[in-house]
């Protein structure tokens, strides 16, 4: 299941988006929510790449992201958080 790490901004109550270690695996560490991430474009691209490179996705937190023109064919998601996400033109 995804980690319920809160955003590093103390006044923010949002859940932090997933981060990745040097090997490209989901890391269970503190981070920012999408609104406070210093580089939201980079965070979104890392999540897109993770989805692209894995068929079985476990524990991914993407709260608040917009997914556009992404191919989810044969992808399986387990214990992931897509709260407040927007999905457009998925395949």
Give the residues covered by each predicted segment.
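Cysteine-rich micro-motifs
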Residues: 24-37
């Amino acid at each position: 299941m995804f980690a319920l790490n809160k955003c590093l901004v103390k006044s923010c109550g949002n859940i932090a988006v997933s981060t990745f270690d040097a090997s490209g695996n989901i890391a269970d560490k503190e981070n920012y929510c999408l609104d406070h991430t210093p580089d939201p474009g980079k965070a979104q691209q890392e999540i897109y790449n993770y989805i692209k490179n894995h068929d079985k996705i476990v524990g991914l937190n993407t709260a608040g992201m917009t997914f556009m023109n992404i191919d989810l064919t044969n992808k399986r998601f387990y214990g992931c958080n897509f709260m407040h996400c927007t999905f457009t033109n998925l395949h």
